[in-house]
Amino acid sequence: MEGMDVDLDPELMQKFSCLGTTDKDVLISEFQRLLGFQLNPAGCAFFLDMTNWNLQAAIGAYYDFESPNISVPSMSFVEDVTIGEGESIPPDTQFVKTWRIQNSGAEAWPPGVCLKYVGGDQFGHVNMVMVRSLEPQEIADVSVQMCSPSRAGMYQGQWRMCTATGLYYGDVIWVILSVEVGGLLGVTQQLSSFETEFNTQPHRKVEGNFNPFASPQKNRQSDENNLKDPGGSEFDSISKNTWAPAPDTWAPAPDQTEQDQNRLSQNSVNLSPSSHANNLSVVTYSKGLHGPYPFGQS
């Protein structure tokens, strides 16, 4: 078999290797896959076109071009920390994918690096998110807003870190998504978002009989009642009994007024039992305010 390989005409091998070159999209995808998604489709097309769309020659040309010693950043995929990871998701549903990555190299990442979509299914319109420059061995979480496809099924896509000059580096991050009508991933992330928002809002201190469902006027009246003496006061009791109007009129009832005055006069008499004259004068003074004087006006 090996002798047969040696006897083959190199020109024939060249023609054989170029079979199917009309399907350039397939060659570009295969070239990108063999390189571990280190090159974008436009770069793959450049090397393939330079080598007459020969896949093997294009790969060799790429490595010859990249042979100079270039300091490439390092990135290691740590774990998928997506909320609800592993759950299926309904069609046409927004969700967030979050990955934990680490700068596993000895140098800090250059500025302007990003996490970029490189192949497979693209979920939504976001194809790139900027990532801050990580120090050596530093770990960070990167989130991407996505949307599930409109049809049920299994989907997969690939993302990679990329420098500002277009150089891909680090591990390939895979997105494997199960789309089902009864999926719970969207609901799980919404509930988690509500819980996070509630826990981060400042809470107001509630005192007394504050009712969050009552009108502001009722809450203010409740606060005013709390400021009063809980046991009441003798002055409040007297003022309410003496000056409170009758239910059907604004003025005190005449009978009630006369009874109060007679009781006040009697109390005055009882306070001075030593002198009958003084008692009469006090009674005369009290009666004189409202009617005839039984003993004459003094």
Curated annotation (Swiss-Prot):
It holds the Pfam family N_BRCA1_IG. GO terms for biological process: innate immune response; macroautophagy; negative regulation of defense response to virus; negative regulation of DNA binding; negative regulation of protein localization to nucleus; negative regulation of tumor necrosis factor production; negative regulation of type I interferon production. One of its GO terms (molecular function) is ubiquitin binding. Expressed in lung (at protein level). Disulfide bonds: none annotated. The modification Phosphoserine is found at residues 215, 222, 272. It is found in: Cytoplasm; Nucleus. Its main location: cytoplasm. Induction: Expression is icreased in presence of dsRNA such as poly(I:C). Residues 262-277 have a biased composition (Polar residues). This is Protein ILRUN. It comes from Homo sapiens.
